[in-house]
Amino acid sequence: MTRKEAEKELIAMLKEAEGGPTYSMEEVDAYMRELLHPKNQIYLTGDTHGQFERIISLCERQQVQPESTFIILGDAGLNYYGDRRDNRGKDKLAKIPITFFCIHGNHEMRPSKELGYQVKEYHGGKVWVQPEYPNLAFAIDGEIYDFFGYSCIVIGGAYSVDKYYRLARGYNWFEDEQPSDEIKEKVERVLSARDWKIDVVLSHTCPLRYEPTEVFLPMIDQSSVDKSTEQWLDTIESRLHYERWYCGHYHTDKEIDKIRFMFQDYALLPHQISLSAESAPSRR
């Protein structure tokens, strides 16, 4: 039973009760429990970079149910090395009986068949999954996922401002860190087919006009930073009718307009709204 279904049943009970039918306390209690403590919560947080202690602690405190999903908005730190060293983090999350849904960041490899991944269906879209870690789902850019009635498009990737620092010291840097032209075309094609209406955007970086300049690193010359992904997201955001936009990347927690930047904070994807083609508001 979803929270939306529980709410619907309770409303129906109240309406019918006006005409005489009665319901047992057990029936009412079951629906109330689902409303107050839903099993299918959708959690969100920002970059973890392989440090999962805070997520594990939250799951234990909240007694997160197996039906729940935990979205990490990029740079989860699970595909950094491309070898067995990545299994340390995967093993930790495998012990938590929920699904972790990871957006692609800029400090990690894109999953592939060469890394032992398989493409599977998940909430109406496609994800990469390793058979050894079935509860770790890696989102594919441009796919739309249905999280309990919410249409969510994923747009991962960003530019690494520490690119040359990494290259100079032999640290990993990934050439395909930003969305390719093919990915951009897919995103635009998918959104166009939906008349540019979506409930939620899940991205790693943000549209250019929303960049949190207050957290820019002072030693980085911003004129040398490739902002092509942010510029492109600007064009997407200006055309898109959406309810919420969640992103990570900047290691800050803040909210402006409908966009929420996430790092160590947590959010729950609401259950009660859905932006249909008929009810979508005009934002521009």
Residue ranges and their predicted role:
Residues 44-46, 70-75, 100-107, 139-140, ...:
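Active-site neighborhood of phospho(di)ester-bond hydrolases with catalytic His/Asp-centered motifs
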Residues 128, 134, 148-227:
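Active-site-proximal loop/helix segment associated with metal-binding centers of metalloenzymes
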Residues 91, 99-103, 118-123, 128-129, ...:
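Conserved beta-sheet core of the metallophosphoesterase superfamily
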Residues 2-28:
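Short linear interaction segments
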Residues 49-50, 77-79, 107-109, 157-161, ...:
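Short, solvent-exposed loop/turn segments at secondary-structure junctions
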Residues 34-43, 144-154, 200, 256-260:
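Beta-strand-turn-beta hairpins that frame and shape the catalytic cleft
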Residues 25-35, 41, 45, 50-147, ...:
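Core catalytic region of metal-dependent phosphoesterases/phosphodiesterases
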